[in-house]
Amino acid sequence: MSSHDHLKNLIQRIELSLTNHYTISIATAAKEESWSASVFYVSDQKLNIYFISFDESKHIQGILKNKRVSATINQDVSDWMQIKGLQLQGVAYKVPEQHRKNILNAYRQKFDSIHELLDLPKTDDEKKIAKQFNSISLFCFEPHWIRLLDNSLGFGSKEEIEIKNQTWLIKE
């Protein structure tokens, strides 16, 4: 397999992982405090990850002080050889308002249950979520480095890509 084909295949497997998972754990560090939070997300073809959160939340306060973050996406498994997932490093920032509609539409497409929750909320909690969904802040996590772990290919199997000159390359 050529290096170009290998890169293309690796990016496709990363995209598949992003598509097939729903939560990402974002880790922040600012001053002497670190924090992590799991959030629902959507992603785009550039491997950017978008999530919604309150400006007052601890992980967002960390991002506002230090935009460099790390993250993981994985399934909870009990067998070492089933461990698969992504480790990521990059920057996170608040998304400009003009992109809000497209990102929220992506949420509606990825999360089937969100239609009923937002359009026909039943409980007080659902009504609260529906109201907040339209005003909550949107953030982008722009990875600069991604590691794909897949122990089904052999214990400790990992492949990495990184951004160089705005292009994904295999990290050697």
Segments from the language model and where they lie:
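Short, surface-exposed beta-strand-loop junctions and turns on beta-sheet-rich folds
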Residues: 57-59, 78, 154-156
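Catalytic micro-motifs at enzyme active sites that drive phosphoryl/nucleotidyl and oxygen chemistry
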Residues: 74-77, 126-128
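Short, solvent-exposed aromatic-acidic interface loops
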Residues: 54-58, 108-111
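Charged, gly/pro-rich active-site loop segments
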Residues: 2-5, 84-172
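Alpha-helix boundary recognition
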Residues: 18-19, 64-65, 108
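Short beta-strand segments
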Residues: 21-55, 61-63, 69-75, 83-88
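Generic structural signal for secondary-structure transition and capping sites
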Residues: 22-23, 68, 112, 146
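Extreme N-terminal tail/first-helix region
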Residues: 1-23
